[in-house]
A protein has these predicted regions:
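Glycoside hydrolase catalytic-domain context in secreted enzymes
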Residues: 1-343
Length: 343
């Protein structure tokens, strides 16, 4: 429904397919972005493997094969796809273990072949860049670490990808073209590059951007920040809140005295060895001035009619600890759901 809402142009409520109000939708991540080993993150070297211990690889494809590739509206299927960083471990019959963006099986045989996808395929960001260390947030060239940057571009093109996400340097692409000429001849190289050019340009033609790439400021001002749209969005958010339990009919509450306990906010590690946000601290999880519009605030549990407690899941890192490695371990640690230290 979301993809159809983006891509289709509607006239008097009728889906007319591609048109001037269409937005190209890029879906991600093929063939899935969830089953990283140990719950780790494939943005890092330590999370580069996707594993399927229950042999559920095909189940993960259903969001694509029965969803975004099988739209009921006039556009038919999502017009662009982004593969994920992971190495889909044990899936390629040839035994090759490379990131999905490099895989001739995942992209060529499955996506392009079995599922006949001929839209734009764009790599995830930075897959051709070098990776400095296991914990580094830089390049994500999984399975191709020993190859040159040019060879990485060449392999991605061989897999059937059209666009390099996060790459602003044309030099390695031009060098990859030369490699294609050496292996398949000038005509073969032109055919391959023109194939991607057609896929990329087609979306501009479909949406009318090739003929008119400009936006009417008057129309834009009517759409952006439109009060009716904002109201509809807010109401949709309210409806998305699901009450799991209401033991003893605790809700709804009339105006009463409520206690809001503070919550602990740890300092969060970020990319490039940096930290995100302020130092670790205790603070209220909501704006108390806003809450005073609806409740009388209690200064302690004893004087409150009830409490509203905001709980956040424990955070113990992304499953890799540099300090563990420095102490002689391998760095790989469980992602614990305990609030206390993992033992």
């Amino acid at each position: 429904s979301v993809v159809e809402g983006y891509q289709s142009t509607f006239v008097d409520g009728e889906d007319t397919g591609w048109g001037s109000e269409s937005i190209v939708a890029m879906i991600k991540h093929w063939p899935s972005g969830g089953p990283e080993e140990g719950g780790r993150d494939a943005h890092f070297n330590y999370g580069k493997y996707a594993v399927y211990p229950g042999n559920n690889f095909k189940t993960h494809l259903k969001a694509f094969t029965e969803g975004a590739f099988a739209l009921q509206g006039g556009t038919g299927r999502a017009s662009a796809v982004m593969p994920y960083y992971t190495i889909s471990h044990g899936i390629d019959p040839s035994g090759k273990e490379v990131g999905n963006n490099y895989s001739e099986y995942i992209i060529g045989d499955l996506l392009r072949g079995k599922y006949t996808y001929d839209g734009v395929v764009c790599t995830d960001w930075g897959v051709t860049h070098n990776n400095a260390a296991v914990e580094s947030f830089d390049g994500k060239c999984w399975g191709m670490e020993q190859e040159s940057i040019v060879r990485r571009h060449y392999q991605i093109l061989k897999a059937g990808v059209d666009q390099f996400g996060g790459n602003n340097d044309k030099a390695p692409i031009l060098e990859a073209y030369k490699l294609w000429v050496a292996d398949y001849g000038e005509e073969g190289a032109r055919q391959r590059f023109e194939q991607s050019a057609v896929r990329l340009l087609l979306n501009s033609f479909r949406t009318g951007l090739f003929e008119n790439a400009y936006t009417d400021p008057a129309v834009a001002s009517e759409v952006v920040g439109n009060p009716e749209f904002m109201k509809a969005g807010y109401e949709a958010q309210l409806k998305s809140v699901v009450m799991v339990k209401n033991l003893g009919n605790a809700l709804p509450q009339k105006r009463a005295k409520v206690w809001f306990p503070k919550r602990f906010y740890p300092q969060t590690p970020g990319p490039f060895g940096l930290t995100m946000g302020p130092e670790a601290h205790w603070d209220y999880p909501v704006d108390l001035q806003l809450m005073e519009k609806y409740y009388d605030l209690a200064s302690s549990p004893a004087e409150a009619d009830f409490a509203l407690v905001f709980i956040k899941e424990p955070f113990h890192g992304e499953g890799y600890d540099v300090n563990d490695r420095k102490k002689g371990g391998n760095g790989y640690v469980p992602i614990s759901l305990q609030y206390r230290p993992y033992k």
